Design a protein with these regions (language model features):
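Glycine- and small hydrophobic-enriched segments that form the cores of compact globular domains
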Residues: 28-179, 185-210
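Claisen-condensing/thiolase-fold acyl-transfer catalytic domains that form or cleave C-C bonds
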Residues: 1-6, 29-32, 36-42, 67-69, ...
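Short, mixed-charge aromatic SLiMs
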Residues: 101-104, 167-176, 217-221, 256, ...
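Beta-strand segments within the central parallel beta-sheet cores of soluble alpha/beta enzyme folds
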Residues: 93-100, 131-133, 158-165, 206-211, ...
Length: 376
């Protein structure tokens, strides 16, 4: 088996799992592929393995679904491994894990029963952790960031990991759009991220649990109402203006990927709406619109896999900007299209502010965002 030595070399932290890696003869696998009882795994254009259906008739445990879910788990594991190894984090100190991708694992009787979080914790070796899955389409990462902050601030847990794997379904969707328009497959990566939220240490940036924006049931779906609920309302309640935030992290899709697919420049569109709201509220002169977008915005760079680009990719950079750089305040904004699930026509979204740590350990309105590694 050519794959096993590579894994053993690159990921020694996963050594307890190596005994489960056993090669097998796949020369007669074509029949399984033809009957959809297995999904092939390819490496360098050749079949190197396959994922079998976990049940004969349950579509929730079909080879296709198992493939999607195992990609979420595996990419989430890689993100969590990067987090703990590159930041020298003691795995035994992590109490709780929140997984916030957009897939669901379960069987015919409980299709979204879960739990990706616990399965990732098991492989990474987080022996003292439990966890659960949080879902909210693309808004889930920021929902999870707020939940993790609340759990730490309340004293329920000291260290909470927020993690998510990528989406093969979104890869396929994007590839389909590119090919349809005459382009090659432009997005060829699976995204993933992991963040550790810990108690305020007086050094790392703090998450302001008192500056949280939210799209409520009564908010509505107009762009102005959405941006107001997510950005300006929570700032105003704390005596701040839109211009008091140094950087906004919104839907950070890479425009080089989205524009050829016909989706435009998503981050830029978000920043234009925030800037327009600032002008309307008198926080910004209309002549400064373009400059606001340049100064307060970011160029999208993240894979376009739904939850992966939704606000969270800037977290690691924000830590650096709020410690080594000259920023004092940034905002993370996550939005989600709940109507895709056909349970409601409502939109969704939440936001939270991260600030430079002033060194005052007794501040109970914030927790420390200790470290982050994203985009595997």
């Amino acid at each position: 088996n050519e794959i096993k030595p590579v894994i053993e070399k690159e990921y020694p932290i996963l050594e307890p799992c190596f005994g489960h890696l056993k090669g097998s003869d796949i020369s007669n696998a074509q029949e399984l592929f033809d009957t959809h009882m297995a999904e092939a795994l390819y490496h360098d254009g050749k079949v190197c393995g396959y994922i079998k259906a976990a049940h004969d008739i349950d579509v929730n445990l079909s080879a296709h679904t198992m493939f999607e879910n195992l990609v979420v788990k595996a990419s989430g594991v890689l993100a969590a491994v990067e987090l703990v190894t590159k930041n020298d984090i003691n795995r035994d100190d992590i109490d709780y894990v929140i997984e916030c991708s957009e897939e669901a694992c379960g069987d015919v009787n409980q299709r979204g029963g879960g739990n990706f979080a616990k399965s990732i914790a098991e492989i990474v070796g987080l022996q003292n952790a439990t966890g659960s899955d949080t879902r909210g389409f693309c808004a889930a990462p920021i929902h999870s960031l707020i939940e993790a902050s609340a759990l730490v601030k309340s004293g329920v847990y000291k260290n909470v990991m927020v993690v998510a794997g990528g989406s093969t379904a979104k890869l396929g969707m994007n590839a389909k759009d590119h090919v349809k328009k005459g382009f090659p497959v432009l997005e060829d990566v699976v995204g993933g991220f992991a963040i550790l939220i810990s108690e305020n240490d007086g050094v790392h940036p703090v998450l302001r649990t008192d500056i949280v924006g939210r799209h409520t049931v009564k908010t509505g779906s107009s762009p102005q109402a959405v941006i107001s609920s997510l950005v300006s309302h929570s700032l105003e309640e704390n005596g701040l203006k839109i211009t008091d935030v140094d950087k906004y992290s919104v839907e950070m899709q890479n425009p080089d990927i989205t524009k050829p697919a016909g989706a435009g420049n998503v981050p830029e569109a978000n920043y234009k709406m925030i800037a327009a709201l600032a002008v309307k509220q008198g926080d910004l002169d209309r002549k400064e619109l373009a400059n606001f977008i340049k100064e307060k915005g970011l160029v999208g760079w993240a894979p376009t896999q739904g939850h992966i680009p939704s606000g969270i990719p800037y977290a690691g950079h924000a830590i650096k900007d709020l410690t080594e750089g000259d920023y004092n305040r940034v905002m993370f904004v996550g939005k989600g299209s709940l109507f895709l699930g056909r349970m409601t026509n409502l939109f969704d979204g939440v936001s939270i502010v991260m600030e430079r740590n002033d060194g005052k350990m007794e501040d109970e309105s914030s927790v420390s965002s200790e470290s982050e590694k994203d985009q595997i």
